[in-house]
């Protein structure tokens, strides 16, 4: 049986993985179009994790991301990379490293003093902000469909309604928000989708950080009893 050029599958935490078995953008485009026409209701503004395959070493990942966005498919990160070359390709493209499937290495914090990127406004839908080698501070909301990421910490002095990633590229970081109702969160390669966020922390001010192979949540304000 011939292997599908484009395949979607669900993974842990209800995540959706996109696997590509071609290095030709034109072939991928045709396959995506065919796949979406077969189930149009499923592929409406979905966020996916791109599973790295050998074919992708020959693909311009930025062009691939733009191609997917033409079909309202948003790549939020890349998993299953296996070597330094693949890691560099992903980092150069501006996509987040979300680790290798089922493999997590212990991340130990190191003393550091990162610069800070500050945004003094709301982050609108479809807007992407990435703070490379720095922390990110947002004085406003991260709207649905927006994406913010930082190699360090992400501080949101407003509502987190879109997607946020801290500790990108296997760094240490935390997400701080005054109101959690995110579409997707990731810290140091650990991630959760909206449907799997702990109910008790939703619509609350929280800190989110990685602890071994899980995401941990702490209230920023003491709960009234």
Swiss-Prot record:
Annotated keywords: Cell cycle, Cell division, Septation
A GO biological-process term: regulation of cell septum assembly
Self-association state and partner proteins as the record states: Interacts with MinD and FtsZ.
Primary role: Cell division inhibitor that blocks the formation of polar Z ring septums. Rapidly oscillates between the poles of the cell to destabilize FtsZ filaments that have formed before they mature into polar Z rings. Prevents FtsZ polymerization.
Stored HAMAP family: MinC (MF_00267)
Family classification: Belongs to the MinC family.
Protein name: Probable septum site-determining protein MinC
Source organism: Pasteurella multocida (strain Pm70)
Lineage: Bacteria, Pseudomonadati, Pseudomonadota, Gammaproteobacteria, Pasteurellales
């Amino acid at each position: 049986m011939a292997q599908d050029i484009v395949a979607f599958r669900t993974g842990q935490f209800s995540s959706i993985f996109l696997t590509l078995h071609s290095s030709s953008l034109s072939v991928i485009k045709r396959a995506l179009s065919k796949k979406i026409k077969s189930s149009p209701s499923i592929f409406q503004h979905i966020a996916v994790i791109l599973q790295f395959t050998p074919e992708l070493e020959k693909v311009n990942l930025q062009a691939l991301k733009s191609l997917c966005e033409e079909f309202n498919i948003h790549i939020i990160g890349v998993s299953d990379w296996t070597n330094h070359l693949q890691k560099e390709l992903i980092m150069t493209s501006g996509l987040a490293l979300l680790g290798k499937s089922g493999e997590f290495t212990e991340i130990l914090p190191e003393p550091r003093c990162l610069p800070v990127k500050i945004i003094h406004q709301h982050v609108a839908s479809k807007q992407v902000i990435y703070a490379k080698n720095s922390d990110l501070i947002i004085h406003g909301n991260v709207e649905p469909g927006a994406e913010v990421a930082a190699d360090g910490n992400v501080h949101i002095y407003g509502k987190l309604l879109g997607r946020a990633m801290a500790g990108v590229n296997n760094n240490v970081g935390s997400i701080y928000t005054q109101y959690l109702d995110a579409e997707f969160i990731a810290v140091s390669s650990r991630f959760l989708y909206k449907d799997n966020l702990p109910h008790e922390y939703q619509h609350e001010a929280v800190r989110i950080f990685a602890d071994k192979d899980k995401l941990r949540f702490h209230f920023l304000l003491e709960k009234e009893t």
